[in-house]
Amino acid sequence: MYIVVKWVCPHHQAEAFAKRVVEGMKEYPDDETIVKPIIDGAMTAKKDGFHVTGIAEIINGKTKEVFDLVNKRNLFIIQGLDGMKYSVETAYSRNEALEIFGLQI
């Protein structure tokens, strides 16, 4: 299972957001006993701002711990930044999704 974090950062907040991300990663670093980063901040520029996506694999049985870490980090990062949006979702791996339908590779 994966955790997918998506951010939308208004253009005028880009520098402040980048600084907060660096600070947030220091304050709440990834814990490789519960999560393994896959994509660490892929960014695209769009009309409404910069869209940033991070994807990490959740270690079996550590979903709550990962959500706690990610939400603490996200709340730290957005503090004082107007116009920021973010979402946190889970996604199944291909094999996990196939198992739901009784299939295997």
Where is each model-derived feature located?
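Secondary-structure boundary motif
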Residues: 27-30, 75, 79
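Charge-dense, low-complexity polyampholytic segments
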Residues: 70-74
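Short S/T/G/P-rich N-terminal loop/turn motif that feeds into the first structured element of a domain
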Residues: 1-69, 89-105
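Conserved short beta-strand edge segments in small beta-sheet-based binding/regulatory domains
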Residues: 76-92
